[in-house]
Structure formats: structure tokens, C-alpha cells
Amino acid sequence: MNAKVFNPSIITKEQIAGLHFPSQEVLVLPNEIKQRRKNAQEGLLLGNRYKAKVRIVFEDTETLKQVEATIWGLTDLHVILKKGTTIPMHRIYTIDICP
């Protein structure tokens, strides 16, 4: 599935806690996975320094979703948003800096 072809549902970060995530990786190509990690790290730096928000497109068990939030932390497996809300890294299609 190419996330850029579909229109994701826009949600708030508070809604993420009630979502369920499958264990399958959404990206296929190794370079896409590497770029996602790089974008997450850039988002973390901008979030910590300037409180800049990113647009994250991800997929839970139901549909493609989009949230705009500040990245507060990263682990190998998760992107951490404000108030400890997490999104599994393997379910994220794109992370872009908000204009």
C-alpha cells in the first residue's frame, strides 16, 4: 500500500491510545525503512529544540490515519509523543515536518 495514494483519517494524539496495531511492517523496501528512521530522528531534534510538529501517517488494524504532533522520544520500536503516547515504528508510512 502506498500511503501517498490514499487519504488518511485525521486524528488527535489522544485518540492513539485506543488503537490496536498489527505486528506486520507496513514498508517493504529497506531504504524506505531507513528513511523513516532518519525522519523520526529529525522530528525528534526539531521537537526537542523548537517544539516543531510532524505529520505522521500510519496504519492501525482498521485504516490509514494521520496525526500532527511533537515527537518527544524514540526507541528502536516506537515513536513517543507527548504524555507517553506511542506509535509502533513498523506501522508508520511517513513522518514529515509540518509547514
How would you describe each model-predicted region?
Residues 72, 76-99:
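Short, Lys/Arg-rich amphipathic alpha-helical interaction segments
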Residues 49-50, 63-76:
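Short, compositionally biased strand/turn segments
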Residues 60-67, 85-88:
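Short coil-to-beta-strand transition motifs
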Residues 1-63, 95-99:
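Short glycine-rich, low-complexity segments
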